């Protein structure tokens, strides 16, 4: 347990930051889930729109230090590829 005033303050700050980061991660996961659901339905236009709204949220997660930049780059790339495949006509 924190004993000095400084360590008590640091513990309070860490707790507050953890709560903010948890909310940010939850928000990002919600946007990702919307993209996944749109892809699952097979509607390319809805999936593209969902991806377009999710990309800035993912980028913001990197800026705020919630997610690693390579993790976000990988997620964006994979989702964009899946949306692209969905929007292409089926090869006969």
From Swiss-Prot:
Gene3D superfamilies attached here? Ribosomal protein S20
Respond yes or no to whether keyword Ribosomal protein is given for this record. Answer: yes
Write out the GO cellular component annotations. small ribosomal subunit
Would the keyword Cell cycle turn up in this protein's UniProt record? Answer: no
Region Disordered, as annotated, extends over: 1-22
A molecular function (GO) held by this record is: small ribosomal subunit rRNA binding
Q: What keywords tag this UniProt record? A: Ribonucleoprotein, Ribosomal protein, RNA-binding, rRNA-binding
GO terms in the biological process aspect are: translation
**A Pfam family name for this chain?**
Ribosomal_S20p
Enumerate the NCBIfam families for this protein: S20
Q: Which family does this protein fall into?
A: Belongs to the bacterial ribosomal protein bS20 family.
Specify the protein name.
Answer: Small ribosomal subunit protein bS20
Q: State the gene name recorded for this protein.
A: rpsT
């Amino acid at each position: 347990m924190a004993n000095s005033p400084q360590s008590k303050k640091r513990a309070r700050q860490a707790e507050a930051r953890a709560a903010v980061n948890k909310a940010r991660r939850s928000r990002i996961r919600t946007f990702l889930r919307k993209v996944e659901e749109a892809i699952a339905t097979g509607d390319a236009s809805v999936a593209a729109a969902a991806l377009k709204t999710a990309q800035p949220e993912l980028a913001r997660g990197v800026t705020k230090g919630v997610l690693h930049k390579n993790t976000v780059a990988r997620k964006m790339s994979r989702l964009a590829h899946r949306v692209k495949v969905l929007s292409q006509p089926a090869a006969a």
